[in-house]
């Protein structure tokens, strides 16, 4: 399962909650990947696409080893999310009605 939405919307909370109930689940958090693996990337569209490709690669390795990845990331590109859906990835968008949070996020990451 791939959860996506704005920062603070509850993606990690949902992953952690579901992780308790699914055997052999594995949490992949976009913030942790960015700080430990993708620290060389920024927040421009191309870098965010590279980040998603890296996460997808890690998730594929987990699936091949018999784990069930629960992924939490911030991502907004409809084309990429549609591509992920077309290959069978279950995407769940987590939304929170907060105009202020959205404005802060967009200003911080220039999106």
What residues fall within each predicted segment?
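Conserved substrate/cofactor phosphate-moiety recognition/catalytic segment
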Residues: 12-60
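A short local structural element in Rossmann-fold oxidoreductases
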Residues: 38, 81, 102
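The conserved Walker
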Residues: 6-7, 12
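Hydrophobic anchor at the beta1->P-loop junction of P-loop NTPases
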Residues: 3
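Glycine-rich phosphate-binding loop used to anchor ATP phosphates in small-molecule kinases
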Residues: 44-91, 95-98
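Short, glycine/charged-enriched secondary-structure capping and boundary segments
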Residues: 18, 41-43, 83-87, 106-108
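Small-molecule kinase domains that catalyze NTP-dependent phosphoryl transfer to phosphate-bearing small molecules
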Residues: 95-111
């Amino acid at each position: 399962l791939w959860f996506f939405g704005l920062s603070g919307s509850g993606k990690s909370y949902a992953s952690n909650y579901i992780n308790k109930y699914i055997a052999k689940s594995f949490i992949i958090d976009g913030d942790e990947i960015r700080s430990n693996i993708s620290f060389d990337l920024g927040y421009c569209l191309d870098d965010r696409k590279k980040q998603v490709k890296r996460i997808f690669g890690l998730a594929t390795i987990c699936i091949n080893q018999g784990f069930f990845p629960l992924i939490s990331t911030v991502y907004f590109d409809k084309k990429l999310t549609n591509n992920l859906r077309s290959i069978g990835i279950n995407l769940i968008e987590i939304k929170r009605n907060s105009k202020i949070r959205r404005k802060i996020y967009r200003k911080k990451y220039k999106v």
